[in-house]
Each structure stands twice: as structure tokens, then as C-alpha cells.
């Protein structure tokens, strides 16, 4: 069994201002996405640094607003009805990936109108930059000792740990780290490699949907369901798995359609001498 590091969730205290690790993880996520997108833009003639900066800004708004609204609608709607002001109390925690995903999709529509880019060209461009943000977000969950895993059944399992926020003090899976690795690091490597060569329009976006869908669906088997949600379907499916299934199915259809049409948005990468 591992010992939980029990890191103080407050990273910095500047007088009355307290900076939490979770907020810093979001900042790192956006900075990393901006850096990766800037690198990709230098390899394509039709992208500029201004476009990238705006794209990351629009995406950040979509993530924060969509993530919060999605969490309220998907997981805590009763609390919202009892106290609508709670929606704006973001410091209390509560963000949804699926809500953030929808928020980003809507934000990209506005960005595309501004720069006259097609929606899927834009999504294909930015998709490989997203998993690192997911990784930082899950690390933030781990530091905050939230969204931990289910109880470890094998007494010899070496990676279980007791989270200080667990009222039952059970040895649990560090599912936040599993998600950081699968939804973050591994998905980033896959998408970065796949997008390093010209692919049909929608193919990169499709691979993101499928890759995230598979990773999230599998890791949910190790993650403790929300106490007020439990298992929603068939006695074993969680809300996260249910919301992920449409992403996986849409991704499968998209990659099939992409290779049927074979429309390309860019040619070989630029070389710099």
C-alpha cells in the first residue's frame, strides 16, 4: 500500500488571497495547450500566433463555463434548484469533463466564424493539445483528494492508498492517477503521433473521441461513483460511462466517414532549416 502524500490544497497564500493547486493545474493546462498549439501552428501556413492565442482563450472560456454548468446539470441539479447562486460558487469545486467538452464545441463555433475556418479543421488542429490539460486536471483532483477510486479488493495490490477525505478510511485505487495516465499522457502520445502526418478531415477529432471514450469507460470501473448517483444502468454503469458511450459511438462513425470522404485540410509539414 502507498501512503497518500496529503499535500496542502492551498499552493500559495498571498495575504487574504489563497491560490489552490486545482486552480494552478488549470493554469498549467491552458499554458501547455497554448504552447503545443503554437508549435503546431508553425508547421502550417494557414495558422498564425494570433489565431492560436484566440483559440486557447475561447477554449478556456468553454471549459470553465461548460464544465461548471455541466457539473450542475449532470450531477448536482437538485442542489442548484435549492440554491441557484451555488452555480457561481466555483471555489466550492465541481467541474464536469462532458460539460466542458460541450462548452468547447460551442466556443469553437464562435471562433470559426471569426477566422473563417471549418469546425472540424479547427477541432483536428486543437485535439492533440487537449489530453495534457486533462492530465493536469486529474492531478489536481488527486492533490485535492477528490474523485478517488473504489476499494481495493486484492490485499496484495501495491498501489492502493487511504485518502484523508474518505469518511470510511478504506484502501482505494488512486483512480485520478489512472485517469491522468490513460486520458492524459497515453492519449496525448497517440494523438500527437497520429496527427504528425496529414489525415482526412475529422479523423484526428474522431480518434480523440474514441480514445477518451475507451479510457474513461475503462477507468470508471476503478473510480468510486458519486455518492448521490451510484450505478445508473444495469447495476454497474456509472453516469460517467453513460455520458461517454455517445462520444465513443460518434467517434467510430466519424473516423469511418472521414476515410470514406478523404478530404484533407493540409499537406506535408513545413520544414525549418
From Swiss-Prot:
GO biological process assignments: lipoprotein biosynthetic process
GO MF entry, a single one: phosphatidylglycerol-prolipoprotein diacylglyceryl transferase activity
Keywords from the UniProt entry: Cell inner membrane, Cell membrane, Membrane, Transferase, Transmembrane, Transmembrane helix
Catalytic class of the enzyme: transferase
Location relative to the cell: Cell inner membrane
Pathway annotation from the record: Protein modification; lipoprotein biosynthesis (diacylglyceryl transfer)
EC number(s) from the headed UniProt entry: 2.5.1.145
Membrane topology: Multi-pass membrane protein
Transmembrane portions of the chain: 19-39, 55-75, 90-110, 125-145, 174-194, 202-222, 230-250
InterPro entries, alphabetized: Lgt (IPR001640)
Pfam assignment, any one: LGT
Principal location: membrane
UniProt GO cellular component terms: plasma membrane
UniProt superkingdom: Bacteria
Binding site for a 1,2-diacyl-sn-glycero-3-phospho-(1'-sn-glycerol): 138
Family according to the record: Belongs to the Lgt family.
Function: Catalyzes the transfer of the diacylglyceryl group from phosphatidylglycerol to the sulfhydryl group of the N-terminal cysteine of a prolipoprotein, the first step in the formation of mature lipoproteins.
Name of this protein: Phosphatidylglycerol--prolipoprotein diacylglyceryl transferase
Annotated organism of origin: Acinetobacter baylyi (strain ATCC 33305 / BD413 / ADP1)
Phylogenetic classification of the source organism: Bacteria, Pseudomonadati, Pseudomonadota, Gammaproteobacteria, Moraxellales
